[in-house]
Amino acid sequence: MHVLSPSPGDCIFIPACTIHALGAGLVVAEIQQASDCTFRLYDWDRVDASGSSRPLHIEQALEVIDYDRGPVDPIRTESIGADRIETLVQCDKFRLMRLSKPESYELDLSTCNVIAVPQGTATLETAHGQIELGMGDSA
């Protein structure tokens, strides 16, 4: 087992078929390809809205786990000043970028974009006006 103690702002890319769990006290943005498939090995004794235990998928998970995958670690990026644009993850399903106080950035509108604001504020300018986003907002 590989245990991490993440710090605020860390990015950790966990490829599909990698067993993982979150510890107490974490707030995360889980970014992934669109999928209706999650195999739970354990569910911390949580229950659904009706009070029933959620199903576990042990046999299915054991069939797809990548047993050769090594430990994952936070992605370390080089700080290039206050205004920076970093590609944190680039895989065949999505790209994750971190924009830190850029004066402006034009989105590629030929693909789906999600803007999340983990701290501070952001202003989106569109043909229809401006949208103000605050900490915790996404669009």
Predicted regions and their residues:
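Glycine- and acidic-residue-biased ligand/ion/polar-headgroup-sensing regions
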Residues: 1, 25, 100-129
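Short acidic-glycine-tyrosine-enriched beta hairpin
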Residues: 2-12, 126-139
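A generic structural signal for well-ordered coil/turn residues at beta-strand boundaries
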Residues: 8, 16, 25, 90-95, ...
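Conserved active-site beta-strand-loop modules that form the wall/rim of enzyme catalytic pockets
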Residues: 11, 18-20, 26-30, 85-86, ...
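Ligand-binding loop in jelly-roll beta-barrel domains
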Residues: 17-38, 130, 134
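Short, glycine-/Ser/Thr-/acidic-enriched flexible segments
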Residues: 19, 36, 104, 119-122, ...
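C-terminal amphipathic alpha-helical segment
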Residues: 39-109
